[in-house]
């Protein structure tokens, strides 16, 4: 991804750094509308997730996470922008005439061919079961449940690594640093997700953040005591506590939020690194 810096004529362009624009011309049969109800509200209209609202209207692109077009070669026709994710997407024309969107693998260019199946070459963009991959393979779009489609390592620049295979399970190291077991029959795509430099972007101004549907974040220390435990005081007062807390009084730093007794507890060999 190429980072584009604007000429420093205004404060917003002086601090902004955006990626080079990848145009989007979605196919009608591969898009559908979205109905965002409430933007962070529940069925009663009460805010359950803060700092959400507004944003530009979006059309959802139907992404093929299952990669179930077995042994049919496809060609990358376009690389497009998707407003619903930070990774780019590719339009694939398959040999049987079908057209699908997939996540753009890093390094893939227009004209490359891809295929999914059981005995396909270990090539960037190809999808195959973990049992057919050699150890050390970099993968993304990984299934957790067989046939459900990829659910892990789908963000821009995400990549996991196949580190072991034993019995019916394969051991993966995920982008978060977590090491967990997954069935060897689950499929994954070879390579890394594209748009690696997405973290180098700087929106530069508040309006760009609002376009993404993210509302301003107000610090608790500038609120009133009725609104936040950090609020109140005369002038610029400290929070008045040993440690910061959330608006509901729970510890804000270091508290583990993962639920106990989850089904995947026995599958996780090492927790993600912080």
From Swiss-Prot:
Keywords: Chloroplast, Plastid, Ribonucleoprotein, Ribosomal protein. One of its GO terms (molecular function) is rRNA binding. It is found in: Plastid, Chloroplast. SUPFAM superfamilies: Nucleic acid-binding proteins, Translation proteins SH3-like domain. Its main location: plastid. It comes from the Eukaryota. One of its GO terms (biological process) is mitochondrial translation. SMART domains: Ribosomal_L2, Ribosomal_L2_C. One of its GO terms (cellular component) is chloroplast. Pfam families: Ribosomal_L2, Ribosomal_L2_C. Residues 1-21, 225-274 are annotated as: Disordered. The keyword GTP-binding does not apply. HAMAP family: Ribosomal_uL2_B. Part of the 50S ribosomal subunit. Belongs to the universal ribosomal protein uL2 family. This is Large ribosomal subunit protein uL2cz/uL2cy. It comes from Lepidium virginicum (Virginia pepperweed). The lineage of its organism: Eukaryota, Viridiplantae, Streptophyta, Embryophyta, Tracheophyta.
